[in-house]
Regions:
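Short glycine/proline-enriched loop/turn "hinge" motifs that connect secondary-structure elements
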Residues: 1-2, 184
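Alpha-helical scaffold segments that mediate packing/assembly in large oligomeric complexes
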Residues: 3-94, 219-225
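Active-site loop/lid in soluble adenylation, ligation, and acyl-transfer enzymes
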Residues: 9, 13, 182-184, 197-199
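Short helix/loop capping segments that flank catalytic or ligand/cofactor-binding pockets
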Residues: 17-19, 124-126, 171, 201-203
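General N-terminal targeting signals
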Residues: 25-27, 32, 43, 47, ...
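Intrinsically disordered or highly flexible coil/loop and linker segments, enriched in small
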Residues: 36-43, 47, 104-111, 201
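Extended oligomerization regions of viral-like shell subunits
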Residues: 55-185, 190, 196, 222-226
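Structural signal for terminal/edge beta-strands and the immediately following C-terminal loop/tail
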Residues: 201, 206-226
Length: 226
């Protein structure tokens, strides 16, 4: 397990706002910091050499244990078509690729695939897969029940697909807020810390795949004929 520590230095003057309010404020800030740290580790973590989990966007060399960035498995355009056959075809290739593990053994992945994209790209994906129903409602859905999720740790222009149950994320125990009033005495401040143990790694290099996003909203140039 890896130890994850978060801390905050609070000026003692803030205690005038009340000790209960300060503790609640510090706890909220540090827990949010935890969430950001875990999100980074589970997506982009560089492994034990970096004292981090192995992220979903990484490959692990089975012989040396070296952790490297995943190479792109293809391109996704989410281009419009009369009946959505382009999107269905592109995502079919994703589902097909994830249906085989690193040892070449087939596995069931339907209803288990999650697509993670940066919030900037999420708007483009949503726009390309949203339709208006006969009742006037706007509905967004992806083929094969792929679940879209936003994450700031995924680079812009990339889409991360992973299979539920193929990534081992472990968090041990709870956390406890500790207060140290002597550490920063000269600065007239109090140090607050929380710590927790966590780790994560994919079961194999086919637990997740990375694709390039090339979503364009520029209409194709018209071809003039004489």
């Amino acid at each position: 397990q890896l130890k994850l520590t978060a801390f905050a230095a609070i000026p003692n003057d803030m205690k005038e706002l009340g000790p209960e309010w300060i503790e609640r404020y510090v706890r909220t800030v540090l827990v949010e910091t935890y969430s950001v740290g875990l999100e980074f580790g589970f997506i982009n973590g560089g492994g034990s050499v970096a004292h981090q989990p192995v992220g979903l966007m990484k490959d692990v060399n089975p012989e040396t244990g070296a952790v490297t960035d995943k190479k792109s498995s293809g391109k996704l355009t989410f281009a419009p078509s009369d009946k959505g056959e382009i999107v269905a075809g592109e995502l079919y290739e994703v589902v097909k690729a994830l249906s085989v593990d690193a040892k070449g053994k087939s596995r069931k992945v339907l209803n288990k695939i999650v697509m993670v994209v940066n919030p900037i790209d999420a708007i483009g994906v949503q726009a390309r897969n949203t339709i208006q129903t006969a009742t006037g409602q706007w509905v967004m859905a992806l083929p094969y029940n792929i679940k879209p999720v936003e994450c700031e740790e995924v680079p812009v222009g990339k889409a991360l697909f992973f299979v539920k149950g193929q990534y081992i994320a472990a968090i041990a125990g709870g956390y406890k807020l500790k207060e140290f009033d002597q550490t920063l005495a000269f600065e007239d401040a109090t140090l607050y810390t929380i710590k927790q143990f966590a780790n994560g790694k994919p079961k194999d290099n086919k637990a997740a795949l990375v694709y390039d996003l090339e979503i364009s909203f520029t209409p194709p140039a018209e071809t003039k004929t004489k």
